[in-house]
């Protein structure tokens, strides 16, 4: 699992999916929020397009560690095209997994399960969870 974890993190760190912000004049129907981890200076700007209680698009820009970048990349893949109710469930179960709390692995895409090792590194919880928690905030204001 450790090698799989490293390989997946490195893959998404070097080639993150859905990375890059949409220009301001093209941001019609997008919600935009920013979050910063004050303990390590990681930060993310998240742009999400919502339509008819669905996540239509996710774009982001990240300054931070490999775990944050990989987490944002996988989140953008796994939650794009989800309805909001399912997205909320996935976010909560992903964060529970990171904290070594009860979660349903069948709700999460297989690649996300490599983040289960974060429970052994509590200092990395915020790195992995920032994009997910920010998206949950965005959903809650819809």
Sequence positions of predicted segments:
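Domain-level signature for proteins that mediate thiol-based redox and metal-cofactor handling
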Residues: 1-142
């Amino acid at each position: 699992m450790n090698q799989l974890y490293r390989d997946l993190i490195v893959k998404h760190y070097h080639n993150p999916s859905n990375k890059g912000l949409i220009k301001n004049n093209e941001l019609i129907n997008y919600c935009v929020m920013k979050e910063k981890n004050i303990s390590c200076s990681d930060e993310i700007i998240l742009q999400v397009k919502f339509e008819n209680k669905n996540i239509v698009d996710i774009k982001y820009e990240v300054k931070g560690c490999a775990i944050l970048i990989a987490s944002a990349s996988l989140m953008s893949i796994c939650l794009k095209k989800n309805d909001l109710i399912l997205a909320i469930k996935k976010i909560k179960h992903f964060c529970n997994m990171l904290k070594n709390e009860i979660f349903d692995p069948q709700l999460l895409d297989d690649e996300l399960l490599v983040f289960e090792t974060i429970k052994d590194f509590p200092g990395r919880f915020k790195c992995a969870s920032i994009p997910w928690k920010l998206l949950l905030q965005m959903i809650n204001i819809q």
